[in-house]
């Protein structure tokens, strides 16, 4: 759940072809770590630099979170003014680059946030022939309307692309043509309205809509 919008993976029915295939002897069977069917959201696809708070609910959460029966992780991203921030990180496991900026137009009661993120991860530093690359882009807006009953509008558009790849090490006596690669591209659009009703039985009316399209192969 990101900014009140569930991340639904119910339609993901893909699994790795050739579950018994071994790309390199030290990596084990390919399907052991790549089959994510019925296992929830792949947390590697979520950029962390935009996160402001994280809430973890154990057990069966409220119905507002959707058809969840084993807990939920709620992520709230940064909103409003933030200075231009660029970050680069490199270690034995990953390389990461991030740039983001937030604007707040006080007169217009409008907040805008933009960010780009790139990650090149090496899950096992002993196996230099396997990597996981992720790139994300995000644009978010929040607008407050000064009416008798305050109205807040939220909009966001997010893109995530990943490449998961492994190939044989020619130094261990295997042919190089035996390789594994999967790509994933997702675009998600979310729109929300929150209307505060101070003098009625209903305190707040909330309407949220979202559209998500994925290309996974």
What annotation goes with each model-predicted range?
Residues 49, 81-83, 96, 105-111, ...:
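Strand-connecting loop/turn motifs
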Residues 1, 40-44, 67-87:
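N-terminal periplasmic accessory domains that precede
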Residues 77-78, 82-93, 112-122:
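Transmembrane beta-strand segments that form the barrel wall of outer-membrane beta-barrel proteins
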Residues 38-41, 70, 94-98, 134-138, ...:
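Transmembrane beta-barrel architecture of outer-membrane proteins
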Residues 5-57:
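Short acidic/polar hinge/loop motifs at secondary-structure boundaries
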Residues 119-138, 142-204, 208-217:
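Flexible loop and strand-edge segments within Gram-negative outer membrane beta-barrel domains
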Residues 53, 85-87, 111-115, 152-156, ...:
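Residue-level detector of the transmembrane beta-barrel scaffold of outer-membrane proteins
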Residues 65-68, 88-98, 125-131:
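Solvent-exposed loop/turn segments connecting transmembrane beta-strands
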């Amino acid at each position: 759940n990101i900014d009140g919008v569930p991340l639904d993976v119910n339609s993901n029915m893909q699994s790795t072809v050739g579950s018994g295939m071994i790309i390199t002897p030290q990596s084990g069977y390919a399907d052991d770590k790549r089959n994510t069917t019925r296992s929830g959201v792949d947390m590697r696809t979520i950029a962390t630099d935009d996160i402001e708070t994280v809430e973890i609910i154990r057990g069966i959460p409220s119905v507002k979170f959707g058809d969840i029966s084993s807990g939920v992780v709620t992520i709230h991203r940064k909103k409003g003014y933030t200075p231009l921030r660029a970050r680069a990180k490199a270690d034995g496991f990953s390389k990461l680059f991030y740039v983001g900026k937030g604007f707040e137009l006080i007169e217009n009661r409008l907040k805008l946030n933009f960010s780009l993120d790139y990650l090149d991860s090496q899950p096992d530093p002993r196996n230099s022939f396997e990597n996981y690359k992720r790139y994300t882009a995000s644009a978010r807006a929040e607008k407050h309307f000064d009416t008798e009953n305050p109205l807040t509008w939220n909009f966001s558009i997010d893109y995530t692309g990943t490449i998961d790849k492994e190939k044989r090490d020619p130094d261990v006596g295997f042919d190089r043509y035996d390789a594994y690669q999967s790509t994933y591209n997702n675009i998600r659009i979310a729109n929300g309205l929150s209307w505060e009703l101070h003098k009625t039985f209903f305190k707040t009316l909330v309407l949220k809509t979202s559209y998500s399209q994925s290309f996974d192969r």
